[in-house]
């Protein structure tokens, strides 16, 4: 991650690119962008952003979604793919959290001013949802 290490990596990539592609194509390349893998903290922040988007949709019904750190770790264990980066996180949250909250709304298990807390049921090794009627809309 040091500037010298990054520059050395960039040069190695350019060498491979030059050996693989024709000069006509190389003339069209302006630069090579190098990415580093996302860290654990950054992935947690991405989950927070996804949950914030879901909360934006739930706000009109005066419902708040809270995801515990343990549940976030569970999401990362089940959804993160080093090859795909953070992309699978959104789909996983939609499939396993947002869909369950939607079912709860349709079953009228979430009255207005409710908080849905997502945690991990350790004995079953899956997500659990608890409802508390305490959220006050602003």
UniProtKB/Swiss-Prot annotation:
Stated name of the protein: Heat shock protein 100
GO molecular function, one term: ATP hydrolysis activity
GO BP of this protein: cellular response to heat
A GO term from the CC aspect: cytoplasm
Family (UniProt): Belongs to the ClpA/ClpB family.
Natural source organism: Trypanosoma cruzi
This protein's UniProt keywords: ATP-binding, Chaperone, Nucleotide-binding, Repeat
Pfam families: ClpB_D2-small
Keyword Heme: no
């Amino acid at each position: 991650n040091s500037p010298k290490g990054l520059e050395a990596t960039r040069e190695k990539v350019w060498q491979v690119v030059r050996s693989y592609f024709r000069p006509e194509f190389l003339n069209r390349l302006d630069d090579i962008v190098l990415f580093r893998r996302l860290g654990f903290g950054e992935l947690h922040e991405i989950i927070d952003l996804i949950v914030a988007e879901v909360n934006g949709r739930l706000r009109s019904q005066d419902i708040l979604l809270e995801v515990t750190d343990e549940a976030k770790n569970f999401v990362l264990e089940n959804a993160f793919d080093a090859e795909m980066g953070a992309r699978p996180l959104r789909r996983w949250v939609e499939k396993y959290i947002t869909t369950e909250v939607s079912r709860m709304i349709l079953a009228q298990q979430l009255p207005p001013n409710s908080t849905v807390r997502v945690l991990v049921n350790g004995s079953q090794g899956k997500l659990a949802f608890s409802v508390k009627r305490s959220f006050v809309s602003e």
